[in-house]
Amino acid sequence: MDALIEAARSPDYPAEISLVLSNKPDAPGLMKAKKAGVAVAAVDHKIYAGREEFERAIQILLETYSIDLICLAGFMRLLTPWFINNWRHKLINIHPALLPAYRGLNTHERALADGVKIHGCTVHYVAPEMDEGPIIAQAAICVWDTDTPDTLGARVLEQEHHLYPTVLKLIASDTLKIKGNRVLGFEEKNNSVLKVPKFP
């Protein structure tokens, strides 16, 4: 969220952060956004009878603020097909792994346990299934022998802070095109550079 707000401060950035919304009234991100001059709102899921009632309250807020695109960041509740289909191709998420690998939680621990040599993050359009949907962009890093879940997670987070604003910029500029399950238009010059050792 911080990276998106910071990017949107640039005069030539094509998107505006109109609202930061959380289901947790005490979420630290709300205070950060408020200090940055962004409108904030909390919709506490605990006071609603079910997910659909909760999401309809969110929908009213989004319509009130004339929201065009939703960027999920640390939102840990599964959304219903009703909400997702209502925001089809207008709802994106960032996930701390190279999807389709490591859907769900504890991605860094699982990557290390499997001994993978490449890890990273993915921005994708949201589908009703968890961590599914057309992949927009990915950033990859090498996994070091000395990595722990914390060190690996910190380096992936650095990539997230670069990748998410880049993707939002491309969407707001109407640069991306969806063709089946592929997203086209994330040109090679935007791709993360993965440095690998040279072999003799």
Language model features by range: what are they?
Residues 1-28:
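N-terminal Rossmann-like dinucleotide-binding module
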Residues 7, 23, 73-186:
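Donor/substrate-binding cores of folate-linked one-carbon enzymes
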Residues 22-23, 47, 51-52, 65-81:
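N-terminal glycine-rich "phosphate-gripper" loop used for MgATP/nucleotide binding
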Residues 27-39:
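N-terminal beta-loop-helix "entrance" segment that forms/cooperates
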Residues 180-200:
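Short, basic/aromatic-enriched C-terminal tail that caps enzymatic domains
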